[in-house]
Design a protein with these regions (language model features):
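N-terminal Sec-pathway targeting helices
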Residues: 1-16
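Membrane/wall-proximal cationic-aromatic binding patches
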Residues: 17-80, 90-100
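Structural motif
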Residues: 55-56, 109, 220
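Second-shell loop/turn segments in exported
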Residues: 58, 83-87, 192-198, 222-228, ...
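Membrane-embedded segments
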Residues: 59, 63-143
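Secreted/periplasmic serine-hydrolase-like ester/acetyl group-modifying domain
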Residues: 114, 125-218, 299-318
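Flexible, glycine-rich surface segments
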Residues: 183-263
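C-terminal regions of proteins
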Residues: 236, 245-305
Length: 318
């Protein structure tokens, strides 16, 4: 009888441990966060910025973080911005980061890169139903890496040199590697990418739109050039969504001739992300839109922004 009870006792103890650790590793307010490590790192990094000095915020997944370079916007237009994007970042995580940042900043504009809208923005892994069930029951199985972010300085959150350098670049990943895209220039017509917008996506898009309205932030949506990810059908899907919320949508995939992108030199990974060559062209074009259409001020020469010139000179990106 005692032998029979041992496995049961062990199982009960294990369940209790999983329940307790699940409670401990899920911080209050983070119940709907997919990647706590990424969200923590972003929140801590942007908190280093002087209060109420950022006029533009960029957010999205890696299409955003590999494209929008705050120091290029600063050097060319004097625009103070920050890139909140991150690798595979889901819309629910974008929302959590934005919500925190708006406690300390009063930006005029939020630029949401649209590729993240096609992600499954659920908190748990939906690719494996058993794993999803287990993660929902015991969140510690999902958030097991959170210990890496506890009691670490901001430059160690995320714990890679590349992440630390991106934090210095105000969220931008300055990647120079070249792997050419050799597919069709007519990718918008030929691509057959899934156009599904999942319920969680629609929920969090509305939450972001509402949060922007509450804080007097104008929301715009942008698709950066990416032969791997974009098509006319996807464009139409995002345009329809933006129309519902009266949000302006810029699809830069439609401006290949204007941007003068060269897909043999301007992509990091065969047409998925832009490298630094490509991002320079996109930012040079888009900074003019921010200046002319949205009247984002030029802060160069102002005492409160002297640190920007110093940081830009130290990085020497442009």
């Amino acid at each position: 009888m005692k032998k029979a009870l041992k496995p049961v006792s062990f199982l009960l103890v294990l369940i209790c441990l999983l329940m307790v650790t699940s409670y401990l590793v899920t911080p209050k307010g983070y119940e709907n966060v997919y990647d706590i490590q990424l969200v923590n790192r972003k929140i801590n990094a942007v908190s280093q910025e002087k209060e109420n000095t950022l006029d533009v915020l960029f957010t999205g997944d890696s299409e955003a973080s590999n494209t929008f370079s705050p120091f290029q916007y600063w050097k060319e237009q004097g625009i103070a911005s920050y890139n909140l994007g991150g690798s595979a970042q889901r819309l629910n995580d974008c929302y959590t980061v934005l919500e925190d940042v708006l406690k300390h900043q009063k930006p005029k504009l939020l630029v949401l890169e649209a590729n993240t809208l096609f992600r499954k923005n659920a908190v748990y892994n939906q690719d494996d139903s058993v794993l999803m069930w287990a993660e929902q029951l015991f969140p510690v199985l999902h958030h097991h890496n959170i210990y890496k972010t506890i009691n670490l300085s901001v430059n160690l959150l995320g714990a890679t040199k590349e992440n630390a350098y991106a934090d210095q670049c105000k969220g931008y990943y300055a990647r120079v590697r070249i792997r050419p895209y050799r597919g069709s220039d007519q990718y918008m017509k030929t691509n057959k990418r899934d156009t599904t917008l999942y319920p969680e996506t629609l929920e969090y898009f509305e939450k972001i739109a509402d949060l922007c309205k509450e804080n007097n932030v104008e929301l715009i949506v942008v698709s950066v050039p990416s032969p791997k990810n974009w098509s006319d059908a996807r464009h139409d899907t995002i345009q329809e969504l933006c129309n519902q919320y009266d949000v302006t949508y810029y699809d830069l995939n439609k401006l290949d001739n204007v941007l003068a992108l060269d897909w043999t030199t301007d992509t990091l990974d065969r047409g998925d992300h832009l490298n630094m060559n490509g991002s320079k062209k996109v930012n040079a074009y888009f900074s003019e839109i921010l200046k002319e259409k949205y009247h984002i001020p030029d802060h160069r020469g102002e005492a409160d922004y002297a640190i920007w010139d110093k940081q830009e000179a130290e990085l020497n990106l442009y």
